[in-house]
C-alpha cells in the first residue's frame, strides 16, 4: 500500500439555512453530504464510466467534528488521497472556515466487481489517473 497525502480536490461549500439543526449549527449528517459531493466531483474528473460492471464503493466513512459551523457560512472542503492499496483507497476530507479546521472526515473506497459483489484490483487505467 502506498501512503502519502495528496490534495486531489477542493471545493467551496455554501451552508444553507436548511443545513442547520435544532441546536443552531450544521447538522452532523450534512457533513457527510458535503464529503459525498466532493468525492463525486473528484470521481467525475477521472472521466469514469460509472455504468460499468466495476467501480467504486464506499465501505467506511467517519467524521470528527472539531468546531460548530453556524449559518451563514462559506467553507472550503479539501479532499486528499491518504493511501492507495491494491483494491482500496483512503480519502481525507478537511473542512475549513476562515482558515480554521472545523471537521475532519475519512473515507475508504473499494473497487468492486458489481456482478460478483467482490473487491477487485484497481484497473491499470484507473490507477494511472490517481495521483
Give the label of every model feature segment.
Residues 1-76, 82-131:
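Terminal targeting signals and extreme-terminal segments of soluble enzymes
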Amino acid at each position: 500500500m502506498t501512503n502519502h497525502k495528496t490534495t486531489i480536490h477542493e471545493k467551496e461549500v455554501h451552508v444553507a439555512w436548511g443545513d442547520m439543526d435544532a441546536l443552531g449549527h450544521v447538522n452532523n449528517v450534512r457533513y457527510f453530504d458535503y464529503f459525498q459531493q466532493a468525492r463525486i466531483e473528484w470521481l467525475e474528473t477521472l472521466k469514469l464510466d460509472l455504468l460499468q460492471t466495476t467501480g467504486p464503493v464506499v465501505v467506511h466513512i467517519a467524521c470528527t467534528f472539531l468546531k460548530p459551523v453556524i449559518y451563514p457560512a462559506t467553507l472550503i472542503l479539501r479532499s486528499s488521497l491518504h493511501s492507495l492499496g491494491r483494491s482500496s483507497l483512503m480519502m481525507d476530507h478537511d473542512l475549513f472556515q476562515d482558515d480554521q479546521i472545523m471537521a475532519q472526515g475519512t473515507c475508504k473506497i473499494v473497487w468492486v466487481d458489481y456482478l460478483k459483489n467482490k473487491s477487485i484490483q484497481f484497473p491499470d487505467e484507473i490507477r494511472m489517473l490517481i495521483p
